[in-house]
């Protein structure tokens, strides 16, 4: 739907690219167009039976953004471990794009949707505090009109800090595929290594059990998000035995 970078500067484009983007925008600003397109995509995915919608902010890395028109991303040797998630949201470079994401959340909420926000790549406690403050600055203070903000466990540090991070957030979403990659330092897109990424390995199960235990202690929700569950009987057993756990499968 969108071919250009969310922080695009039209003056930096070639005449050909500028003409392409201008045609796409139809008189709107780049940010206005992004909001309208992404709102349409999100609203089309929301079904009448969805009482509550968890919406995750962008977890895209610089490698993916670098494929877009008007990008001005700094080249990173390892984008997956680079500027993404909270470190991107709080940066001056990404402020226009973060504003777009916040506008979308506010528009959805003002339209009557019960939106609960999920923050990806919360690496540290300071990340947690920073993003809550940043959301408040954008008119999305946690707790106002029952607005809930969750954080995503994408790497082991967020699991190790889960009890403290829960002071800042209303719940946890465990991105199991991402957590597995960062736990074992395996790129699942690498054909030579992908077979070694076992999501029911004992190390990962220990991390999952910690998140479940800590959320139960404070009576806050835990959602496990993963691409597929069928190949993992150990995880199936763990999830069945776990109190109050919810599972989201994207297969």
Whereabouts are the PLM-identified features?
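Non-catalytic helical/linker scaffolds that mediate oligomerization, partner binding
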Residues: 1-251
